[in-house]
Amino acid sequence: MVDLSVLDLAYIGEGFTPADALANTLDLAQHVEAAGFTRFWLAEHHNLAGIASAATAVCIGHVAGGTKSIRVGAGGIMLPNHSPMVIAEQFGTLETFFPGRIDLGLGRAPGTDQQTLRALRRG
């Protein structure tokens, strides 16, 4: 059997809130888990009004906590935007809470506009 996965952006549709989008993301993860999918990925995007997954590690914890066995991961974290140590600590902690279920995908593209990029790298 082929392993299948889903990549979700936690899209905030017109008339919906970020809370609605994250509830829909969890619902989708539960459905694809029940259908036998093996992984659920969340994408990191910043400063976009229609996407609720900017705090990717937090969203991954939310999805992993609401599912039983599906692997949950970042597809991907743009490492130039973050301290590698912080990412390692966040995903190590997630792995402690959800052993064998957390995946970390890394990228190197800025993935955002210059103003947001400067704000991300400031810290």
Which role does the model predict for each range below?
Residues 2-18, 81-123:
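Flexible, glycine-rich active-site loops centered on histidine and acidic residues
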